[in-house]
UniProtKB/Swiss-Prot annotation:
Renumbered zinc finger spans (PHD-type): 129-190
Name of the protein in question: PHD finger protein 24
Region of interest: Disordered: 30-108
Domain of life from the UniProt record: Eukaryota
Keywords: Lipoprotein, Metal-binding, Methylation, Myristate, Phosphoprotein, Zinc, Zinc-finger
Cross-referenced Gene3D superfamilies: Zinc/RING finger domain, C3HC4 (zinc finger)
Amino acid sequence: MGVLMSKRQTVEQVQKVSLAVSAFKDGLRDRPSIRRTGELPGSRRGTVEGSVQEVQEEKEAEAGTSVVQEESSAGRAAWERLRDGRGVEPEEFDRTGRFTPPAFIRPTRKLDDDKPPEICLEPREPVVNDEMCDVCEVWTAESLFPCRVCTRVFHDGCLRRMGYIQGDSAAEVMEMAHTETGWSCHYCDNINLLLTEEEMYSLTETFQRCKVIPDCSLTLEDFLRYRHQAAKRGDRDRALSEEQEEQAARQFAALDPEHRGYIEWSDFLSHESLLLLQQLRPQNSLLRLLTVKERERARATFLARGSGSTISEAECRRAQHSWFCKRFPEAPSCSVSISHVGPIADSSPASSSSKSQDKTLLPTEQESRFVDWPTFLQENVLYILAARPNSAAIHLKPPG
């Protein structure tokens, strides 16, 4: 009787075979080759002395290359993680009893990617989460953690075995996942995973030319230096103006909400991925990236802030800021602030105070101009995507 294999078991077996083949190829590549030309007269090859001499030559060759290999192995591993869409992997990560993360395949753009998607204001779309855990594909009566962006759900134990939550972070995930703020899964938390292979190659090439080291934090000086070098990539005579440099400094402050003086690599990578999407993708392609939950939150915001089928331009601008309103959980045990994925209720004190501040920032002429639903989506799509990560950083600061 044949043995039935699930899709996940098949993927894991393919991954194991691929890893074995890759390890074998790496071993052949790293093994030093000793080139022997002609045998000299009086050669000791084939004797005991000759064997000892060959072993000594191999040890000397290995010692000469070991230093170079150790120096480049860390950098090579970081670039490979960046290319494959994987995060930082601690050296002391205990993989005993862990699940093998599924192989990630970067998305590809379809032929009709730039055509306008059908995202109507009415009727509303039903939002239904998956019934089975995305990792083990098993339904249990235990509490499942829903993602605030997609419809995936996860078990606490599965997230631990995958290495996505460690230590006491499980309690914080449990608190956030069942609140209005919500929690983003490992797929939605990493905006870089939205890039295609070609877009990722372009971003990696920019990092290499600007000498950006992956998995390393950046200070304000590093961030501004990178901005200047990236601006000169296409035109050597081009440089950032004072206004652009001030804007970059404000963006750095938004990426460093705790005022530590540096920004994490994951926040920097998300910010640069958003800028690349803004540069290379048309608006219709960006709209196709929105999930059903994000589209529903956008509808709720438009209907709450607008009047009928239109909304004032001032309210549209305020909505761009509202995606990043910080909501601190009421539970004192959770000390992590998460970026809000939707606007705060209009009746809340935080909403009224933010509106009064926005009115001082926005011109009064915008109150008389109105935008429709498609325009509202186009002007907010990037900021909706930027609010996906769990980090408290603002990965794309709205103007104003």
